[in-house]
């Protein structure tokens, strides 16, 4: 067998084993909590239009900004192969500095505090 067939065989066997274990394990000790659906703490029968905390929205926006930062800076190690790597690293440093200053400003303004 070649390498691709071996990898496919191992992946299929591992998937089958995990599927069988996932069906077998819950039957060992069933109780009420394991049999009930996961509800995330929200009332499923109440109104869906509940007020949403602005703190959660702010944390989500900060997470998206820093996630975008990681996505932009991830290919940075290959930046030394460009014609002008110094300029690339200067731009990356300026992006990091700008986001760090924004985070410090948000922290000093109290936007990251949960209790008021």
UniProtKB/Swiss-Prot annotation:
<keyword id="KW-0679">Respiratory chain</keyword>
<keyword id="KW-1278">Translocase</keyword>
<keyword id="KW-0813">Transport</keyword>
<feature type="transmembrane region" description="Helical">
    <location>
        <begin position="3"/>
        <end position="23"/>
    </location>
</feature>
<comment type="function">
    <text>Core subunit of the mitochondrial membrane respiratory chain NADH dehydrogenase (Complex I) that is believed to belong to the minimal assembly required for catalysis. Complex I functions in the transfer of electrons from NADH to the respiratory chain. The immediate electron acceptor for the enzyme is believed to be ubiquinone.</text>
</comment>
<keyword id="KW-0520">NAD</keyword>
<keyword id="KW-0472">Membrane</keyword>
<feature type="transmembrane region" description="Helical">
    <location>
        <begin position="87"/>
        <end position="107"/>
    </location>
</feature>
<dbReference type="GO" id="GO:0031966">
    <property type="term" value="C:mitochondrial membrane"/>
</dbReference>
<dbReference type="GO" id="GO:0030964">
    <property type="term" value="C:NADH dehydrogenase complex"/>
</dbReference>
<keyword id="KW-0812">Transmembrane</keyword>
<protein>
    <recommendedName>
        <fullName>NADH-ubiquinone oxidoreductase chain 3</fullName>
        <ecNumber>7.1.1.2</ecNumber>
    </recommendedName>
</protein>
<comment type="similarity">
    <text>Belongs to the complex I subunit 3 family.</text>
</comment>
<keyword id="KW-1133">Transmembrane helix</keyword>
<keyword id="KW-0496">Mitochondrion</keyword>
<dbReference type="InterPro" id="IPR038430">
    <property type="entry name" value="NDAH_ubi_oxred_su3_sf"/>
</dbReference>
<keyword id="KW-0830">Ubiquinone</keyword>
<dbReference type="GO" id="GO:0008137">
    <property type="term" value="F:NADH dehydrogenase (ubiquinone) activity"/>
</dbReference>
<dbReference type="Pfam" id="PF00507">
    <property type="entry name" value="Oxidored_q4"/>
</dbReference>
<dbReference type="InterPro" id="IPR000440">
    <property type="entry name" value="NADH_UbQ/plastoQ_OxRdtase_su3"/>
</dbReference>
<keyword id="KW-0249">Electron transport</keyword>
<feature type="transmembrane region" description="Helical">
    <location>
        <begin position="56"/>
        <end position="76"/>
    </location>
</feature>
């Amino acid at each position: 067998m070649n390498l691709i067939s071996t990898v496919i065989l191992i992946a299929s066997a591992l998937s089958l084993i995990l599927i069988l274990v996932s069906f077998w394990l819950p039957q060992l000790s069933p109780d009420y909590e394991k049999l009930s659906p996961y509800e995330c703490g929200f009332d499923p029968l109440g109104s869906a239009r509940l007020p949403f905390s602005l703190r959660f929205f702010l944390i989500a926006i900060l997470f998206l900004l820093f996630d975008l930062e990681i996505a932009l800076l991830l290919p940075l190690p290959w930046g030394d192969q460009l014609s002008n790597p110094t300029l690339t690293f200067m731009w990356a440093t300026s992006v990091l500095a700008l986001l760090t200053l924004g985070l410090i400003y948000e922290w000093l303004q109290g936007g990251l505090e949960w209790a008021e």
